Amino acid sequence: MIGAFKRLGQKLFLTLLTASLIFASSIVTANASIAPNFKVFVMGPLEKVTDFNAFKDQLITLKNNGVYGITTDIWWGYVENAGENQFDWSYYKTYADTVRAAGLKWVPIMSTHACGGNVGDTVNIPIPSWVWTKDTQDNMQYKDEAGNWDNEAVSPWYSGLTQLYNEFYSSFASNFSSYKDIITKIYISGGPSGELRYPSYNPSHGWTYPGRGSLQCYSKAAITSFQNAMKSKYGTIAAVNSAWGTSLTDFSQISPPTDGDNFFTNGYKTTYGNDFLTWYQSVLTNELANIASVAHSCFDPVFNVPIGAKIAGVHWLYNSPTMPHAAEYCAGYYNYSTLLDQFKASNLAMTFTCLEMDDSNAYVSPYYSAPMTLVHYVANLANNKGIVHNGENALAISNNNQAYVNCANELTGYNFSGFTLLRLSNIVNSDGSVTSEMAPFVINIVTLTPNGTIPVTFTINNATTYYGQNVYIVGSTSDLGNWNTTYARGPASCPNYPTWTITLNLLPGEQIQFKAVKIDSSGNVTWEGGSNHTYTVPTSGTGSVTITWQN
């Protein structure tokens, strides 16, 4: 963006963006291009709501700030805890009633994973204990390279997995059919943290960032699955030996990597490495196909809404010179194209995380973290394959306006259909008042929503400036910065000095108080004098308001 400046009271000059970067909140909104069905959601609390009146006030605040809906974990560990097919939906019915009363839409997440132990987890909700009595630990849980067993989600090698999910999904559908007016889509959980992945980076098993994590296929069930896959591919052990350069005598000698570090340094490049990693990912895609089929059969006849699943943004070690992509491979992400092919085949929307991050550590040891590059790659694949895709921030955003700008740039540049902010408590206090994070969230992301905002043109007359100074708008609502000049909207353009104009997307029907301010390249602010200006945004069409700068 180029700003116009006055020199010697006469001529207009153009300067680079540098002077305006401090106030980058509106950079992406001025000429934003966004998917026509774009919607903004906020994640509900992890913990149980105990005061639904206060919760309703929080949701009304979301509604008043342009948020379309709230996403909610429907914890398996809550509703079917007493025993198989013994469901208690009372809590979530009260929850859904509150969402409806606040005027929001609802996205239930069928959370068949455990909560606790992962980044951002503040509560502990295990998988129902009776589930683990259905079969052996070897058949039902993941086992990693070091011998650790993981119970964050039921292993895809358990043959009864889809039956368990079918019972859970079917009960939800029958109990919430009367809420289809607010349910706008449904998400299914494909693994830890609700993401389609292996539990490869579990802090409780010693993982620390930016470690590669651990492969999760060392149970007898997993090893047998790998052996059978190779038998199906090659037919004979002689064919395996020819392809791998080995001297095996029986398929029972085939195993996952016995030295993970060596494998991710060298072994992954071999035919064996390709075969192993292709199989390792195929376990996830097969699981996705199975649970998606169950979800469609349970939900489509009742709700007829999109079904989706999430892929984690495993962005570290992306450019590692010694083991590139090792963290992704451990999580099960070997070939994103074939991974997304299953989303397409299963008619699933896809959500991808880490939109708030940048590539500043892309070539910095030990991180080699390239989240922005990864987002672009996966989003381009989704666009090329015609897959509806949505975005999230991976970590809570606090006092970091650039993170919201990063999100907005991804959303507008890569045809995302929606964005979900992590999390309610970050932008709304328990009493329903907004936190300081609401303004940058609304300005950068909510105002991108087509048909959800009204273009209002502000004209500011007689606003004389000196070289390096621009004119902005700041006001009483979140989309005008909540009087915080850090989030002032602008800079305005100056087609006929000293008259300045700017068109802003504002929330329909809101009553605003505002002022013009002048901000120079050093961040110095000059406030307009006099009383606040007032304006009511139209509920449809466009709006305009003209003021004269008050000294």
UniProtKB/Swiss-Prot annotation:
Query: Which residues of the sequence carry a binding annotation for substrate?
Result: 73, 113, 121, 310, 315, 353, 393-394, 423
Which Pfam families does this one have? CBM_20, Glyco_hydro_14
- Molecular function GO terms recorded: beta-amylase activity; metal ion binding; starch binding
| Highest taxon above the source species | Bacteria
Which PROSITE patterns did the record assign?
BETA_AMYLASE_1 (PS00506), BETA_AMYLASE_2 (PS00679), CBM20 (PS51166)
PANTHER family recorded: BETA-AMYLASE 1, CHLOROPLASTIC (PTHR31352), BETA-AMYLASE 3, CHLOROPLASTIC (PTHR31352:SF1)
| Protein name per its UniProtKB record | Thermophilic beta-amylase
